[in-house]
A protein has these predicted regions:
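Substrate/ligand-engaging "lid" and interaction regions
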Residues: 1-471
């Protein structure tokens, strides 16, 4: 890939240096499109922060990248698309490279260890604490030179640092898990406590784990992407990744250096990651779910298509302005109105095909946080959030449509939801959902006015009475 002359390529400054300063677990598409791009921006001026990527399960991705000297194409997919070659990685390690992974984690020059392993990769129980019965945790606690879990690897690396009298690295979770830093820190201490009480105490007192929030829509790579990359750079790059131009990396200020100057690369360092998380959850995710259920009922299939429905787009905008934004706490450095405008602009991106049926999945788990918290916040403030009520009504109407068409409801409670939605009118369905605490906050059960409003909204959405629902 040294012959790439039709696309932005990494500067040679520092790129010949083999130095590794960051270890990353889980080199999937999001990491390569997001964190690696931030690091790539730093390397020309500071070559200390090359990444060693560790795949704990498979070798497919790392073999493809190693065959290209670690280089791959990042396609920015917006109305004005662009491509660049990322050269942030120095090594690619698989499950059989445990000795090298141990050596890197023990090396004091590695100061940051990041992870994108999905929520499941943290091996947490339903209450957010470490699941001691998880198969990978049980295996790693029994002792092994090649841990299978992220927790096992991090504790092994921190144990090596403590044994050598070296400073710990900074573990940084980068998955969409609320308070991910606090949860990971607690999991590390709990794991270590079983094996070595002194190490557990050292981790509890000396290791700082920042919470983070990451955001950038990253569609799966496909043949269309590979064809577009080939047409641009003249080579077939099947390690290419794509994302929208918007990227956000919010990192908790832990009062000590993280290693690389991530703020200089565009990350936000703050004492209020939770405020950013709440804004994303209620504005971006809440609007996403609203577009999904209302959009599907109105015949749209993607987010961009739903946003071309002027009535629906206007409704979502009004929901954010009137119901959601006033209930959000002030967050230093975050302009809520500018964030709202940016979110809606992102939704209009015609190049990113984000399917509504995917967003509509798992509604009973998502809606209490995406819309339900705003519903209750307004109720507690003495206001009726008509737009949020209407959005939840669209979910109910969607369930009814799916159940009565015999179409599967993709949700952990799918069978129960289908049974509820198959019987009675929309008002009855709302009553039964509230009674069983599915998708609607439990606090609603004791508020007759909210229940009645939800029943009316569900009926309007079911009947297609959009003028009244969106009014």
């Amino acid at each position: 890939m040294a012959t790439l002359d039709r696309v932005t390529v990494p500067s040679p400054v520092g790129r010949t240096e083999p130095h590794v300063g960051i270890v990353h677990f889980g080199p999937g598409a999001f990491h390569r499109a997001h964190q690696a791009a931030y690091i790539d921006d730093l390397l020309a001026d500071d070559p200390r922060w090359g990444i060693a990527a560790v795949s704990m399960r498979t070798r497919g991705t790392i073999e493809a990248l190693a065959a290209q000297d670690g280089l791959y194409t990042l396609a920015i997919r917006d109305a004005e698309s662009a491509m660049r070659v990322i050269g942030a990685h120095r090594e690619f390690l698989g499950p059989e490279d445990a000795r090298r992974t141990h050596a890197l984690l023990a090396d004091p020059s590695v100061e940051l260890v990041t992870a994108t392993v999905t929520e499941k990769g943290y091996c947490l129980a339903g209450d957010g604490t470490l699941d001691m019965n998880h198969a990978d945790i049980v295996r790693d606690l029994a002792g092994t030179d090649a841990p299978r879990s992220l927790i096992g690897w991090l504790v092994a690396g921190l144990g090596a640092r403590k044994a050598a009298g070296a400073a710990p690295f900074v573990p940084m979770p980068c998955d969409n898990l609320a308070s991910n830093g606090a949860k990971l820190h607690a999991a590390l201490v709990a794991f270590a406590r079983v094996r070595d009480a002194a190490l557990a105490d050292w981790i509890a007192g000396e290791v700082r784990v920042p919470s983070t929030m990451v955001d950038s829509i990253t569609p799966a790579s496909d043949a269309a992407l590979y064809d577009a990359v080939e047409a641009t750079i003249g080579l077939r790059d099947e390690a290419a990744v794509q994302r929208e131009s918007f990227a956000q990396w919010v990192i908790e200020d832990i009062g000590q250096p993280l290693g690389p100057d991530l703020a200089g690369a565009g990350a936000t360092i703050t004492n209020d990651v939770g405020g950013y998380e709440k804004a994303k959850l209620r504005i971006l995710n809440g609007a996403h779910s609203t577009l999904a259920y209302a959009g599907l009922l109105r015949g749209a299939t993607s987010v961009a298509e739903a946003m071309r429905d002027d009535a629906l787009a206007g409704f979502v905008d009004a929901m954010i302005r009137r119901d959601i934004a006033p209930m959000l706490p002030k967050v230093r450095g975050l302009d809520i109105d500018a964030y709202r405008a940016a979110v809606l602009q992102r939704f209009r991106n015609p190049v990113i095909v984000h399917r509504l049926d995917q967003i509509a999945q798992d509604g009973s788990q998502k809606l209490p946080y995406r819309l339900g918290d705003t519903l209750i916040a307004n109720r507690d403030a003495g206001t009726m959030p008509a737009h949020v009520v209407a959005a939840i009504g669209c979910w109910v109407a969607f369930l009814i449509r799916q159940a009565r068409a015999g179409t599967a409801i993709v949700d952990p409670a799918g069978a129960t939801l289908a049974a509820i939605a198959a019987e009675g009118g929309p008002a009855d369905v709302v009553t039964n959902l509230v009674r069983q605490g599915l998708g609607i906050p439990a606090a609603v059960a004791g508020d007759a006015s909210l229940v009645a409003a939800l029943q009316t909204a569900a009926s309007d959405a079911h009947d297609g009475n959009w003028a009244r629902l969106f009014g």
